[in-house]
Regions:
Chain B
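Aromatic- and glycine-rich beta-strand/loop motifs that create alpha-glucan
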Residues: 1-29
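Terminal transmembrane helical anchor/hairpin motif
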Residues: 2, 39-67, 185, 193-272
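Transmembrane helix-loop junction
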Residues: 15, 94, 107, 138, ...
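A helix-boundary/kink motif common to multi-pass secondary transporters
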Residues: 18, 97, 110, 179-180
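Secretory targeting signals
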Residues: 29-86, 116-187, 196, 241, ...
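Transmembrane alpha-helical segments in integral membrane proteins
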Residues: 75-96, 101, 172, 180-182, ...
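Helix-loop-helix units of permease transmembrane domains in multi-pass membrane transporters
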Residues: 90-123
């Protein structure tokens, strides 16, 4: 079973402490979203995991191998897409992928098959034989994701993977991550600014602020019992199954009482003549994030 | 290890020879070669006039051949400097400036392997560029002086090859210090063409001493194997004969020292490089 151990990692840039005593152990396949404001230390952490930066203190073990002391061995299990990816501009996408595949020990024929497969998944098949210097930001992002998946790594580290993508690209990227998590059983660490993205893709969320992990919990534990309902209401003031009901225009926010279900609340509303347009479940993630991050 | 090295070398070489810098150098070498061919035929009979001591004198064909090769080699010894500046100066700084380090540092390959692969790729494209000039030189020589090339020519080419390794290593060292390509370009030019020249003038004028330890002086052995004349106005120990064996060995040693020291320091810096 793959494992990632982050043990007491701190990072200083001069007098600035970018990371403070970060500890994290991941030994089961899951997707971990790292949330935090700009400058919180998310990317610094991912860079230390991928040997782009060295920790000032502490260590990172990949399957028990110290990334700082034996990077060649430790990084065999890692695929990474860190910051906005840039490639050697005079190599084509195919050559870039082949370069990485061959370095990861794949044969020439094996790497060709892998390239076709990953290009198809990430939607860059038609661009494979163009020089990467001619790629758009979004295409580079897709190529970066394809490169990070070469050799089927056990741990995938992605730094804001949907950055620079159009809405369709963002959706496709999230679908790829969900597939990697659910079908391939990989450990995925990815940073994002988007709470909705973390909610959709991740099993666990870590909130980082000012170089510290402020929160680390499973998404399932953050599911709340709040609902947001949009529709047309006739001065509705009270619903027996709900508490903390607030009405604002054509929107009601409420919290279900213990034992109540979403269906029972909706039934009550409809019996009171409410026409419902949309219903949205609300979890605690946003609340938690805003309470921790100043 | 060897396999990963050859893969790295192959891809870097490909990235180099497709670059604009390569085509710019190719254009430069073709222009310079063309100019040298023209000058060779235009001033063939005035070859002795290039050396003040021989001005207006009749000289033997052997010396004429040596002078011909000296002048071609004089230009040749500067070509690797320009090529190394184009290919070597941005070698490491560009990984930071162009952000490609974010792609290569997380790969399961030693940074020393990456650096050496890139270094040899850079040396290779410089060799290709200089080879074009040398081919034109040989063809011109054979037309002007039918017969075999002298052994000294091959000595000069061997020394040039060492110089290419040496100057490329030096530019890699400079590149490893900076995060911006422009700073690396300027620094190499400043050191090689201004600081070294200034040191030459100071040592030769004030102390009448030949600063053999400077890389540009060591590189001049490429032409001095034919005729031991330095173009510096203040140069000491000029001679119509080729450089002595000891002078060749000293120059060779200096170039090898620059090569080894530069590569070792560049490796150490690259190994510990961080990208914020």
């Amino acid at each position: 079973m793959p494992g990632l151990d982050i043990m007491g990692v701190s990072k200083n840039f001069g007098s600035l402490q970018a990371l403070k005593d970060i500890n994290l152990n991941v030994d089961t396949p899951q997707c971990i979203g790292i949330l935090g404001p700009n400058g919180a230390g998310k990317t610094t952490l991912l860079k230390i995991i991928t040997n782009i930066l060295k920790p000032s203190e502490g260590k990172i073990l990949v399957n028990g191998v110290n990334v700082n002391q034996n990077p060649t061995k430790a990084l065999e299990k890692i695929g990474a897409l860190v910051e906005q990816p840039e490639f050697y501009p005079y190599l084509t996408g195919r050559e870039t992928m082949k370069f990485v595949a061959r370095i990861k020990g794949m044969s020439v024929s094996g790497s060709s098959e892998e390239i076709e497969k990953l290009a198809s998944i990430t939607g860059i098949t038609g661009y494979l034989d163009r020089k990467t210097g001619e790629y758009s930001r979004g295409m580079k992002q897709r190529l970066g994701l394809a490169v990070s998946m070469i050799g089927d790594p056990e741990i995938i580290v992605l730094d804001e993977p949907t950055f620079g993508l159009d809405p369709r690209g963002m959706k496709e990227m999230r679908d790829i991550l969900i597939t990697l998590k659910e079908e391939k059983k990989r450990i995925i660490l990815f940073s994002t600014h988007l709470i909705s993205e973390a909610r959709e893709v991740c099993d666990r969320v870590i909130i980082v602020d000012k170089g510290e992990i402020k929160f680390n919990d499973e998404i399932s534990d953050m599911r709340g019992n709040k609902m947001r309902i949009r529709g047309s209401f006739n001065n509705i003031k009270n619903i027996p199954g709900a508490k903390d009901l607030t009405t604002k225009g054509n929107e009601i926010t409420l919290e279900m009482k213990p034992g109540e279900t979403r269906n029972s609340i909706l039934r009550e509303l409809m019996e009171n003549g409410v026409e419902i347009d949309s219903v949205e479940g609300m979890d605690r993630m946003e609340e938690v994030y805003l309470s921790l991050v100043q | 290890m060897t396999n990963r090295f050859s893969i790295t070398y192959g891809y870097y070489f490909r990235n180099y020879y497709r670059s604009r810098s390569f085509y710019l150098m190719l254009l430069l070498v073709l222009l310079v070669s063309g100019l040298m061919v023209y000058l060779s035929f235009r001033y063939l009979n005035k070859l002795p006039d290039f050396i003040p001591e021989l001005k207006g004198k009749a000289i033997s064909t052997g010396l004429k051949e040596e002078l011909f090769l000296y002048i071609w080699a004089f230009v040749l010894s500067d070509l690797p400097v320009f090529a190394a500046v184009f290919f070597g100066s941005p070698a490491i700084s560009s990984e930071i400036e162009n952000r490609t380090a974010f792609q290569i540092f997380p790969l399961p390959i030693g940074r020393s392997v990456l650096l050496m692969g890139k270094y040899l790729a850079s040396v290779s494209v410089t060799l290709v560029i200089t080879a074009i000039y040398i081919i034109v030189e040989v063809i011109t020589y054979i037309i002007v002086f039918p017969g075999q090339l002298p052994v000294t020519f091959f000595k000069s080419i061997g020394l040039l090859a060492v110089f290419i390794f040496s100057i490329s290593a030096f530019t890699f060292l400079v590149s490893s210090i900076f995060k911006k390509n422009l700073y690396a370009y300027i620094t190499v030019f400043l050191i090689y063409f201004i600081i070294f020249s200034a040191m030459n003038i100071v040592f030769e004028l004030i102390y009448s001493y030949n600063p053999f330890f400077l890389l540009d002086n060591a590189a001049s052995i490429v032409e001095r194997v034919f005729v031991n004349v330095s173009t510096s106005t203040f140069a000491v120990n000029n001679s119509i004969a080729g450089a002595s064996f000891s002078s060749i060995m000293v120059a060779l040693l200096v170039m090898i020292l620059y090569l080894v020291v530069s590569i070792v320091i560049a490796l150490l810096i690259f190994e510990n490089k961080e990208v914020k």
